[in-house]
Amino acid sequence: MPEEHEHTASAVGGCLCGKVRFEVHGELLSVVNCHCSKCRRFHGNVGAYTSTQRENLIMIRDEGLKWYRSIHDETPNVHRGFCKACGSSLFWDPKEKKNISIAAGVLDAPTNLKTSRHVWVDQKGDYYEITDDLPQNAGKFERANGENQ
């Protein structure tokens, strides 16, 4: 990775095998835990996402990056990014919005992020309980800036 990027990135992350690496140059929003059936299938459990403006995401290595267009999501025209080599679930990209969501677990530590809420709790799996006091939404959550997660 070029040295000039190391000092300007607010976050760095990537997949398990290293064939996808990226930097975020800008603000990352708080983590939102998505309990919808699509995120649970994509991640194998709850989808924990942060997000940033699309132009803040800089791909350093993307030879493994593959996009799946999810036509059955509640949000139309969503693309889910994953590594085709190792299978890591990486991105949730609603093309009509200005932000792209990044799976919080693929960010290198320390992230300094905090979880702020749960969404789509009406679809949560029956094999776990939500035991914190964070706000819960039955459906999607619209941030003040109009972005949803």
Named regions from a protein language model:
Residues 1-149:
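A short Gly-Trp-Pro
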